[in-house]
UniProtKB/Swiss-Prot annotation:
It holds the Pfam family PPR_3. One of its GO terms (cellular component) is mitochondrion. It is found in: Mitochondrion. Keywords: Mitochondrion, Repeat, Transit peptide. The keyword GTP-binding does not apply. Residues 1-99 form a transit peptide. InterPro entries: Pentatricopeptide_rpt, TPR-like_helical_dom_sf. PPR repeats lie at residues 194-228, 230-262, 263-293, 297-331, 332-366, 367-401, 402-436, 437-471, 472-506, 507-541. PROSITE patterns: PPR. This is Pentatricopeptide repeat-containing protein At3g62470, mitochondrial.
Amino acid sequence: MAAAPWLHLSRRRSSTQTSLRSFLICSSSFDSDEFISSQSRVIGGRGEEEVRFSGALFSRMIHSSTYHPYRQIPLPHSSVQLLDASLGCRGFSSGSSNVSDGCDEEVESECDNDEETGVSCVESSTNPEEVERVCKVIDELFALDRNMEAVLDEMKLDLSHDLIVEVLERFRHARKPAFRFFCWAAERQGFAHDSRTYNSMMSILAKTRQFETMVSVLEEMGTKGLLTMETFTIAMKAFAAAKERKKAVGIFELMKKYKFKIGVETINCLLDSLGRAKLGKEAQVLFDKLKERFTPNMMTYTVLLNGWCRVRNLIEAARIWNDMIDQGLKPDIVAHNVMLEGLLRSRKKSDAIKLFHVMKSKGPCPNVRSYTIMIRDFCKQSSMETAIEYFDDMVDSGLQPDAAVYTCLITGFGTQKKLDTVYELLKEMQEKGHPPDGKTYNALIKLMANQKMPEHATRIYNKMIQNEIEPSIHTFNMIMKSYFMARNYEMGRAVWEEMIKKGICPDDNSYTVLIRGLIGEGKSREACRYLEEMLDKGMKTPLIDYNKFAADFHRGGQPEIFEELAQRAKFSGKFAAAEIFARWAQMTRRRFKQRFMED
C-alpha cells in the first residue's frame, strides 16, 4: 500500500525497510510457548486450540518489577455497553466503532467524568425557549429564599416530563438548584414525576455523592412503584465509584425488597463498577460468594480481568484468564484487548507486541481496537514511524481506520508540533469518510491550548460548531483556561459567557478556571461572587491561590470577606470548606491588625 501523502516520512517498502509483519515475526527473543501454552481440547462443543497464559511469563514480569507482587496495568474506561440499554452500564466491546478513543488521557478521563450516570436518552418535544425561560429563572433566583419557586408559580408552566428532564440536564452539576426545581415540580397540582424524571434526579445526586438523599429518592420511587433496573444501576455505580463496597452490594437487598430479579447482567454491572473503582479484590470476593448462585458468562470473567488489571495484579489477572478457559469459555477479542492494553500501560511493550503477534498468528485476529491500542502507545512514546507501520498494516488487513485511530495519530504528530501533518490527517479523515468527532476536536483544542495558541483553539471550536458537533463542557474549560493562561482575560470571560449561552451547566472545573482567571486579573471581588455561587449550588471548594485572594481583600480593607464565606459554606453544609475559610479569616484578621498597629 502506498504511503499516504501526509506522512512526510521516508517509508518505502523495500529490502532496507522492515515491514510490520517482519518486525513482529523477527522478534528472535520471542518464544510463543513461553508466552502461552496451546492445548487441544473441546470448547463449546468443538475441538479447538486454546491459549493459556503460562506462569513463567508472568513470574518473569512480576519479578522484574519494583512493585512485586503487583504490576502496574491500569486499564482505561471503555465506552461500550456492558448490559442492555435499559441498564445503561458501560463495559467492553469487540466493535471497532466503540474504541475508547481518548488518545489524550486527560481528555478521555474528563469526557468520561462528564458522561451521564445512566439516564436513557429520549428525544424531547419540549420547546427550547420554554426550557431557556425556566433555566434563566432558576439560575438568577435559586440563591434567594423562596423567590425562585414563587416566580416559577407565576410562569403558569405546562409541566411535562420532557421539560423536567431537560431542565435537570442543564443543572446536572448543580445539585441544589436541580433538587429545588425537582421538589417544586413534585408539588404542582396535576403533575407527578415518572421513572425518567426520578432517574434524572438520581443521576445528579449520585454524581455529587449525596447518598442519603439518593437512597430516600429511591425508596420514594419504590413506594410509588416507579423503580426500574436503571434506578438500581445508578445507585450501584455511584456507591462503587465512591468505594462504598458494602453499600453497593446492599443495593441487591433493595432489589430483593422490591421484587426485582438479580441476574447475571446485574451482577456483571456491579462487578464492573467495583473494578472501575479499583476495587478488584472486593469484586473478586463478591464473585466468589455469588458464583454458586448464578452462571458466570464471558462478560463476567472479562470485567473481573479488567478489575485485577486496574489494581495492577497480573497474577490474579492470569488466574482469571485461565479460569475462564477451565469453565469452557474461550477468551475473545475483548479479553485479548484488555490484556494487550494492560501490558502496554505497564510499560511491557515487548510483551504486548508478542501478544499482538500471537493474536495475528493464532487468533482472535486483531480488530480496529487492537490496532488503536498499539498505535496510541507508539504515539504517546513519539514513535510515529512505528505507529504508521501499524496503521498501514491495519489497512492492509482489510480493516477500516476510524476517527479514534486518526485522533491518536493527530495527537502524536501534534505533540511533535508537526501541524502541517495534523491538517493533512484531518483532510484525509474527511476524504475517507471518517470525519472528526467530538474527541478529535477536543484533542486538537488541547494541542493548541498546550502550545499557548488560544486563537487557534477558538478557530477549531468554530469549525466544530460549523460541522454540527456539540462541544462538551471540557471543550469550553480548555479554551477558557488557554485564554486566561495567555492573560487575555476578556476572551476568557467571553468563553464562559458562550458556555452559558449554549445552555451548558458549568462544573467544578469551569468555576475553578474562571475564579483563578479573575484572581489573576486582580478582580477578586468578582471571583468571590462566583465562589459564593459555587457554595450555593453545593459544589466543591475550588483549589485556588488563597494567598493572592486574601492579599487582594487585605489591601482593599475587607478582611471580613473570609468570615462571610465561612458562614456561607457552613450554611450550605460544606463544613470542610467552612474550616478552610475560617482559618483564612483568622490569618487575614491577624495581618490586618498587625498592619493597623504599624500604621
